A protein has these predicted regions:
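Transmembrane-helix motifs of polytopic, lipid-linked glycan transferases
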Residues: 100-118, 355-356, 476, 563
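Active-site-proximal, structured, solvent-exposed surfaces of multi-pass membrane proteins
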Residues: 655, 749-888
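Membrane-interface coil-to-helix junctions
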Residues: 19-113, 129-152, 266-351, 385-389, ...
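Transmembrane signal-anchor helices characteristic of membrane glycosylation enzymes that use polyprenol
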Residues: 9-45, 229-244, 378, 426-433, ...
């Protein structure tokens, strides 16, 4: 490689990626942080655990401050013995701030992937910019969804390794695969890893087809073996992260329901999420067009129409007579009309890469193109979720791209084929949409996937699948650009440009004129319920059309700029390398400007000093910390009790926030706790309630104090017990009966269990009135890891603790002899105690942590050994180095 190639193919692209990574999130280096509600919630959840670490030296595995107690693996978890790290770990030492790190890792990873696919440096740079500038990715980072972004931005390393392995470049392929799998598994987001595997599967299937066509089975099998080894070792090195997540998932709301009524209502609930919940946050059919027209469905949930449209805003003109209140509404108008409850931005993947995809297909569509196109087409259908097409139409939908491409090739002359393909595809899609215009009533592709596709029912938000389009958009786009630069053709250029412009005009500009789309969303029904006049709703709809049309015009503007660059190349006024760099710059600028509009600095960032941790205690928290040092829990009704972690910072909370809380506790909330039923409040030790007038407080809670901030503290009249001996057992054959009956008993005397749990006990507990000689003394209570009790009973009794049971971790001994803990009162811990005086120890032992640590150590050592051998192989063959080849 000569110096000029080294400069253009490596030095300049890497320098450009460094600059972009630093300046895209430059406020982080100025002392700012994202103003992200999810990040605040995470900090609130983690704070007590970090405080505990300061005292013990390690993060606890249990979080007693959330939902009466839950495992902390998905809050703050320190895996041990992971000696093989993902790329983020190493680059963090350079950039120091996480957003620039993750952005650079994504840029470099996709650059390496396209290089592995045989694309030169300038094109690989353009693909890297197209990849990271997808608006949805920026949305993830700004929302501080670090797990999602780390998986997605390390996945390209694995894809690069995959590509190199199938080219016979074992050494580089193994190293990159190891890095990729470390990031995909260690990124703590199984949903993103699962979606990325769609791409892996599609690529491997393509290579399988290629091996069959060329009869190259031996290289394919060798590459597959290397892939299996590197993927297995990379995943094994992250076992300490993976195993606790997998185990906890079986007990969380992502796992199956044990309730028979749920399984009868929806068989999928035996293993995963409820179908309606799993399909929440689906992309509407119109929303797919935001991939090329960012504001087609209204932009964000609240848009400043005064700023965006000015005097051309119909809603603003209608609201001016209403004075300041009307203007305020226009400045935060609910313009979003897509499929989700709210939106912080679009799925914009770039009009320029889309144009390059069309341009590449005008040249030809090879087998890899078809593999990627069909992967994207299936992803689009699955992302629709609740808005998807009926399953009986799915075969026709899947055939549509193939029919649209091959019918014109068979029956029409060459000049007309691209136009006919575009026309057939758009017309066919439109007709299918008209045939199936009521998706709520049909059995859809997503329903089938939830029932039959392994693990698919563990995840919600089908629109999240569109993250895969970021990979496909950039990959296919750069393949198209390479074809053009290798063989510039004015005729093909004008056809590609014309088809792309026609699609934008038909959808973005004429779609509103001819009412091909409704431009109405779920927010409109809520506004009608609030008696908003129909004339204002009509004006809002008109503004949505205007936003879509202006956004389409902006897409046409960037399309014209990209077309101008390629036209200069056609006329040989611009060299191929400079043209590729210019396209890369335009892709970057387009994405940067769109994302800056969605996430303006003034509303996206806040100074780090303005985020105090811990937050200042509220008056009721200060009062309770100083006035009551015994055991109790609170239920903060002055806020959203089950979606706010702030009250969990200083006190043990029966509520809180977590996107994957324990399944049984969620069912308890839905059935009893949200209704404030007294027996359940008492069994959970909820001594205090806080309220500000929004809830009807149970009469057994007395008003104690009203603080200056308007929060009233209520205290339970009866004493709160932490642990007790059950006088009587109520045994049910079905777990549903146990849950449903909790409100019917005095749970300080009765214990409700299932026949299945009763059979786990070594001794049958007796039902008899307690006498004065029987009782429980708390010797030590450390809810993080150990509880020590002295129990006196004259007969075998069931000891009940007001602690949430998690079977994998919590163990018990009676006088040093291990004894089982069973579910009691649906969620609590129950232990049988024989007659006499005994010492009961309840302790946390994370077997999965220990097992994962051992496996990670083995996997890490194997990874380093593989990497050392692979590095040696690379150096040995350095003199024979050849650039990677594109599979096409």
């Amino acid at each position: 490689m000569n110096k000029q190639n080294l400069l253009s193919h490596w030095a300049l692209p890497i320098l450009a990626m460094l600059i972009v990574a630093v300046f895209y999130f430059f406020p982080y280096y100025q002392g700012y942080r994202f103003r992200a509600a999810d990040q605040f919630q995470l900090e609130y959840m983690m704070y007590p655990l970090k405080e505990a670490k300061g005292q013990s030296g390690h993060l606890p595995f249990w979080a007693p401050h959330l939902f009466s107690g839950m495992p902390s693996y998905l809050i703050a978890y320190e895996a041990e013995n992971i000696l093989w790290k993902d790329p983020i770990y190493y680059f963090a030492k350079i950039f120091r701030e996480y957003p620039p790190v993750i952005l650079f890792v994504g840029l470099l990873g996709f650059f390496l992937f396209l290089w592995a696919e045989g694309l030169p440096g300038p094109l690989a740079l353009g693909g890297a910019f197209a990849f990271v500038m997808m608006s949805y990715y920026t949305n993830m980072i700004v929302a501080t969804h670090w797990g999602k972004s780390s998986v997605l931005f390390t996945a390209p390393y694995g894809l690069a390794g995959l590509s190199l392995l199938f080219q016979g470049r074992w050494s580089e392929g193994v190293i990159l695969s190891l890095f990729g799998w470390a990031g995909m598994i260690g990124g703590h987001h199984p949903q993103m890893s699962y979606y990325v595997l769609f791409l892996w599967a599609a690529y491997v299937l393509f290579r399988l087809w290629e091996a069959r066509q060329k009869r190259t089975w031996k290289p394919f099998l060798v590459a597959t073996a290397f892939l299996g080894v590197s993927a297995g070792v990379g995943a094994l090195s992250q076992a300490a992260n993976l195993l606790p997540y997998y185990e906890y998932g079986q007990y969380s709301i992502r796992g199956g329901s044990e309730l028979e009524r749920d399984q009868t209502r929806d068989p999928a609930l035996q293993t995963g999420l409820d179908k309606s919940y799993a399909q929440s946050y689906s992309a509407s059919r119109a929303e797919l067009w935001t991939l090329i027209i960012p504001d087609f469905v209204g932009g964000t949930s609240q848009e400043d129409l005064v700023k965006r449209l000015g005097r051309s805003s119909a809603l603003y003109e209608k609201l001016k007579p209403y004075g300041p209140q009307g203007i305020a509404f226009a400045r935060s108008a609910p313009t979003y009309w897509g499929g989700s409850p709210f939106s912080a931005g679009s799925f914009y993947a770039g009009i320029i890469p889309f144009f390059l995809i069309i341009l590449g297909l005008v040249y030809r569509a090879d087998p890899l193109d078809w593999t990627l196109l069909y992967t994207g087409w299936i992803v689009l259908q699955l992302s629709l979720g609740a808005y998807g097409y009926s399953l009986w139409l799915t075969p026709l939908l899947l055939l549509l791209p193939w029919l649209s491409y091959f019918l014109p090739r068979k029956y029409l002359p060459a000049p007309w084929r691209p136009w006919a393909t575009a026309g057939l595809f758009l017309t066919g899609w439109g007709l299918i949409s008209l045939l199936d215009n009521n998706p709520a009533e049909s059995y859809k592709l997503t329903d089938a996937a939830l029932e039959y596709l392994p693990f698919y029912n563990k995840f919600r938000a089908p629109s999240t699948l569109l993250v895969v389009m970021g990979f496909l958009w950039a990959w296919l786009g750069m393949r198209g650009l390479k074809r053009f630069l290798d063989e510039p053709s004015a005729r093909r250029f004008w056809i590609g440009l014309g088809i792309t412009a026609l699609i934008v005009i038909l959808v973005g500009i004429l779609g509103g004129v001819f009412e091909w789309f409704s431009f109405e969303g779920e927010a409109d029904e809520e506004l009608r319920r609030q008696n908003l006049p129909e004339e204002l709703l009509a004006a809002l709809r008109e503004d949505r059309i205007t936003l879509a049309q202006r956004s389409a015009m902006q897409s046409l503007f960037w399309l014209a700029l990209a077309g101008g660059v390629l036209l200069l190349r056609i006329r040989d006024w611009l060299k191929a390398t400079l043209a590729a760099f210019a396209i890369a710059f335009l892709i970057l600028l387009d994405g940067w400007l769109v994302n800056s509009r969605y996430f303006p600095r003034q509303s996206t960032y806040v100074r780090k000093t303005e985020i105090p941790l811990p937050p200042p205690p509220q008056p009721y928290e200060t009062y309770l910390k100083t006035q009551d040092t015994a055991f109790y829990r609170i239920l903060p009704l002055h806020t959203s009790p089950f979606t706010d972690a702030r009250p969990s910072v200083f006190l043990e909370n029966a509520g809180g926030y977590h996107p994957a809380k324990l399944k049984r506790y969620q069912q308890l909330i839905e059935t009893h706790l949200s209704r404030l039923e007294l027996p359940v409040l008492q069994m959970l030790g909820i001594k205090y309630l806080t309220a500000n007038g929004q809830y009807a407080i149970p009469p057994t809670y007395d008003s104690l104090l009203t603080f200056p901030d308007g929060i009233t503290l209520y205290r339970l009249r009866a004493p709160v017990r932490y642990t007790w001996l059950a006088e009587s057992l109520v045994v049910y054959p079905r777990i549903d009966q146990t849950l449903d009956s909790l409100s019917q008993y005095d749970l300080s005397r009765y214990a409700l269990i299932t026949q299945k749990d009763l059979q786990l006990l070594p001794t049958q507990p007796q039902s008899a009135p307690l006498d004065s000689s029987e009782g429980v003394e708390i010797l030590r209570r450390n809810p993080l890891e150990e509880i020590l009790l002295r129990v006196r009973s004259r007969t075998a009794r069931l000891l009940v603790l007001s602690e949430i049971h998690y079977p994998p971790d919590w163990k018990a001994t009676v006088d040093g002899q291990e004894t089982p803990i069973i579910y009691t009162n649906f969620v609590l811990r129950g232990i049988v105690v024989p007659p006499g005086e005994h010492t009961v120890r309840v302790y946390l032992q994370s077997a999965i942590h220990e097992r994962g640590s051992r496996l990670s150590l083995i996997g890490s050592l194997l990874a380093w050994a593989l990497a050392a051998v692979a590095t040696g192989g690379t150096l040995w063959h350095w003199r024979k180095w050849k650039p990677p080849q594109s599979p096409s």
